[in-house]
Amino acid sequence: MEQDFSMHANPLVAKLQKPASEFTKADIVSYIKENGITMVNFMYPAADGRLKTLNFVINDAAYLDAILTCGERVDGSSLFPFIEAGSSDLYVIPRFCTAFIDPFAEQPTLSMLCSFFNKDGEPLESSPEHTLRKACRAFTEVTGMEFQAMGELEYYVISEDSGMFPATDQRGYHESAPYAKFNEFRTECMAYIAQAGGQIKYGHSEVGNFTLDGKIYEQNEIEFLPVRAEQAADQLMIAKWIIRNLAYQYGYDITFAPKITAGKAGSGLHIHMRIMKDGKNQMLKDGVLSETARKAIAGMMELAPSITAFGNTNPTSYFRLVPHQEAPTNICWGDRNRSVLVRVPLGWSAKTDMCMIANPLEAPSNYDTTQKQTVEMRSPDGSADLYQLIAGLAVACRCGFEMPDALEIADKTYVNVNIHKKENEDKLKQLAQLPDSCVASADCLEKQRAAFEKYNVFSPAMIDGIISKLRAYEDRTLRSEVQDSPEEMLKLVEKYFHCGQRTEQIL
């Protein structure tokens, strides 16, 4: 059956009538010619977590072909601090499947994400994007299956408080206007992200909602659909860029920071995963969680301490990961349980046709709901290195298939109660805890680095660089030192307010 792309949000997909994964150079050239595109942007993440941009004016057809084919040189030492200036040249080559129209450019502009290559024309081994590609390849080689992921992107919008229709403090979940003030901003972000190729599930206001010093702080979330893991990281990267740019146009401030004030909800970056084979979701069997899913979970239980090195990368991360909040602190998993590290959310496994019940005029749908089941890692936050985090999760899930006692570990770490309630103290004492600082996270990565370096997924130099950066924070006792000092906490929040993907490492 021929696929209909006419309603696709990405105008390139709608025009070319093919999925972005099938875009060729000829497609890009054709679209540029037929749609009056005058500029091309190459974009790529650097060490500070922000997308960098290289602008090209389309001089003529020959020049367009040259830049699409050959890419361009960039100074790697200015992008990644651990590349030596004496041998710093890198190539950036556009990936056609990431092409989108820049919604903020005054000139008609087509943008693409790029891959880094070294002087020998080989993929840069320690580039975040290539590391994720290697992690996914190793997962498939070991399991014969495909690793997919998607993110829940939480952020705060900050603006002047009008005082009208005040929302209830810390009760902003799924709130509507006029109590939620930034619904229109969020939906405009969603439209731009979708036009740039992001596969969005939905958006909504989140729990966090408060006023401070005449400003309103409103937490929002945009959640994506599961896609290939490489695409999942790309769309999160572009989404953060779009949200920040649109906020700038509106005069708002935006933060993805894990914690912005004591006693208020912090922002996480929960990552959902599913495992596919021949286009079918392998997370369920006969309506219950499959052995495949439980092995993947066991791998995450095993490597959870070191995954924080990729997903919780600055000191304020560990002010979010505290007991008795929705953010996890213990290494365990469970069904529909928000006190656990890995949660198995509702997966439409009930044997009823809810659509027909709600809409009696509808015929039975026979919709395959098994495709919807995921598992969710709840520890990461907005400081995460997006590519390294998802690569680390792919490694952890792969390890679950290599561990002979994986199913035993899954059984041992399963909980079906709120572990923070007093009556469950004994169960809580049996569970290992996540690191409580960047330094502790670095120690865990040092101990478990072999799993990440296996199959040459993470290079030893990359792991060394991550460990060095985390230890440089010297925050082993910071949480206890500042917990009773609002002034010191505020200084930390301000320092890491614009945190993002961190890729500072030895390359």
What feature does the model see in each segment?
Residues 2-507:
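Glycine-rich, acidic/polar active-site loops that bind/position phosphate-bearing ligands
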